[in-house]
Amino acid sequence: MSTATLEQRAKRGEAPRANDAGHCAHPADGARRGYPRERIDAACDAACRSIAPAWPLDRAIAVNPHWERIGRPVREIAARMAVLADIKVFPPREQIRSAWESARIAPADLRYALQALPAAQAAGMTERNCIDALARPLNLPRLPLLIDVLDDDPLRHERLSWRQAITHQVSQTCAAYFDEHQADWRPHHDQSLYAFWRDTISHDHGIGVLMGLPRLGQSLRALPATRQEAEAWVLERLGLPEAVWPDYLEAVLLTVNGWASWCAYLGWQARLAGESDEHLRDLLAIRLAWGVLLLDCKDDAAARRAFAAVQGHWRDSAALLADAQARLLVDEVWQLAFEAGYQRELAGKLGAVGQPQTIPEAATPAEEIEVQAAFCIDVRSEPLRRAVESIWPAVQTIGFAGFFGLPVAYTPLATSARRPQLPGLLAPSLEVTDAVSGPAGEGGGTMRAAASTARRTRFALSNQASAATRLPGTSFSFVEAAGLGYLGKLRQWLKPSRNPRVRDDLAGLPPRYKAVCRPALVGIDDQAKADLAARILHGMGIARSLAPLVVLVGHASQSANNAHAAALDCGACCGQSGEVNVRVLAQLLNDRATRAGLAQRGIDVPDDTTFVAALHNTTTDEIEGFDVDLLNPIAAARWAKLLSVFGHASDQVRRERAVRVGLDPRMEGGRLLASLRERANDGAQTRPEWGLAGNAAFVIGPRTRSHGAVLDGRCFLHDYDFTQDTDGSLLELLMTAPMLVAHWINWQYHASTCDPAHMGCGNKVLHNVVGGHIGVFEGNSGDLRIGLSKQSLHDGQRWMHEPLRLTVIIDAPGASIERVIDRHPTVRHLIDHGWLHLWRFGETGLLRFSDRQWHPLAMGADPATRQSP
């Protein structure tokens, strides 16, 4: 029977019949007689490509949840998300209204937005239109799915909705299928996800009993055996125009967006390895099949009317999407006005609004620089860099990507726990493991073997304790005998100490080995080491001007009982501490053979130059040095002096941010540090630090462009000197790697703030970890939650993050920047479609890039008083 005939029946309110093509009795036959396979595959693949990946908890990095949608303008995506899934992309109007009424958004900001947005000018939108819109809630209709319109029985208010029930069932199935750590029984992984779900639901009809569907078991017998048959079966039954298939399928995936994002991550990792992965297609088939199962089970007049209504709504989807996009224009104007207020302040701090701009002189002449300190570009580094520079002007601070150019994976001593230490966009190509040696190189293989044996022995006991605490019959006597470490950790959570950060990579090592366990590159020859070192020094901009002491400062956070702890660590290191990277790089650059290779490549490292690895604890703003026992006396003296400077600078930064964490900045320095440590070690503390909340801008240029400016920990800072980059290759790297990482961070915070219900992970207090590391449930049901928790964004009284799109400011000729844009579609989409703002330093002031041209910033003055439009 043709699709047209099925649609005509639906319009008359008739249900599909058992012998219709694709209906229950013969799904395989329906697949053969239905739509061409390539058209089904194209629609399913398009829907799956719309889902951005979500990394597991132990490698948590920030991701723009709309990353796979950047090929369309941001307002179009805002309309699609609203209509397909009730997801908000722009800031809620109540937040904008509050910012307007408090003068956070000034009239000049609104005027600027109306002038800068061509669509607003074309529509003749006025300030009054925009202000009036703030009094009206934005209610955009969502296109219905089968599970929504079939939820119409008289008892629907006394039970879960079908959307909730199906999400729960699919979610629990995924949790069981993907579990690797928590469960003592695991499914066989020779089954596909679809096959596992089909087998599970065929034997467990509990959802039918709970939801009042006694016919579910009968309908399940018609469930197709394979994912491919299920896709065809559902699309035949739906009878929707092919043009709307991708949108309908995307809307279906968005009902289980958390698990879809996990499956997208598995696909991302497979592609990095040159392989393929089908989990996301399986998940789509599962979720699609549920709609048809429900339709079969509710085969009555009401169900037939509901089915016809779905078809009608989706035939009109293009008009609905266009209307939503038009209605969201005012919200796009307010988004830009919100950003303009911050941008004007930023431009003023950089001294570039309406003033002639030339490259400023360095704060300290090169010959007077005694120390170079390279920090991660992370916004939390900015206050510390500023403080260090103010205390000791002979220190030159540098911003560089936090993985320090090392494409490595790290395997701790005596473990198989290999982990990436580089951005999620990349795959590791080098390996790091631990060497064990004293200051004079003593120990070698013998000491390493002894340390490995001791660690494995301790791990064996720890694993027994871990297993005991997971089993229902756990005996306190066993925990008492073998799990004292666990009880100690629990006791510390309940009564937090004021101890400094513990290095987890040393867990299980006896104390005598901890000081001499050092990460090192393996499997790489001297020539490759020299090539790697040369690229990194050129990237940092110090290949021609090395100070006597060069400190490489990674960063890490400190928290207890925090499932999302990795999200506070270094995103460029894939949610890990930057310790491994800086220690390996310092060792590499101090190596005699590497320096000889650098000399052959035209880079002379002075004999008295020493590289030291350090770590910035972003929770307590403490600095820790590594491998300082290897320093010669002169370098050790320089390090001691710098460590004192770091101590004063850290105290300054702690006072600067004390108010944000509810502490008194006037507190005595030791007490303030102790209070921050206590918060960090408190297992009940849901806000150990604010992470990257507030991030809003990225400056790519020499430090002289921002030196002395108080940027409030809101700016990523990456050093770059275009005069030393004659072919533009370094600029291209910066715009296609660090800029994308910063954009991912910025949009994760943006999305989690604008729509915490859909794009955030909810309340930390209610989190339950899924699969040991996959993600979290809020409570014990519902979809896998992705994004940031409410406590990461809100202090209980107000939002600590403003959802502003990233403003990228580059110090480079316009032609050089445009060449990168033209060569990279991803970069072009981000800029042309409004996912970030692009500025550059010009000869007479800042310029903004819009409509493929550079325009003067022309943001106007910020009036002292509000004028009614």
UniProtKB/Swiss-Prot annotation:
Its main location: membrane. It is a peripheral membrane protein. The keyword Lipid biosynthesis does not apply. Keywords: Cell inner membrane, Cell membrane, Membrane, Metal-binding, Transport, Zinc. Its cofactor is Zn(2+). The gene is dabA. It is found in: Cell inner membrane. Zn(2+) binds at residues 376, 378, 555, 570. Coiled coil: none annotated. The lineage of its organism: Bacteria, Pseudomonadati, Pseudomonadota, Betaproteobacteria, Burkholderiales. It comes from Burkholderia multivorans (strain ATCC 17616 / 249). GO terms for molecular function: zinc ion binding. Transmembrane segments: none annotated. Pfam families: DabA. InterPro entries: DabA. This is Probable inorganic carbon transporter subunit DabA. GO terms for cellular component: plasma membrane. Part of an energy-coupled inorganic carbon pump. Residues 1-32 are annotated as: Disordered. Forms a complex with DabB. Residues 8-17 have a biased composition (Basic and acidic residues). Belongs to the inorganic carbon transporter (TC 9.A.2) DabA family.
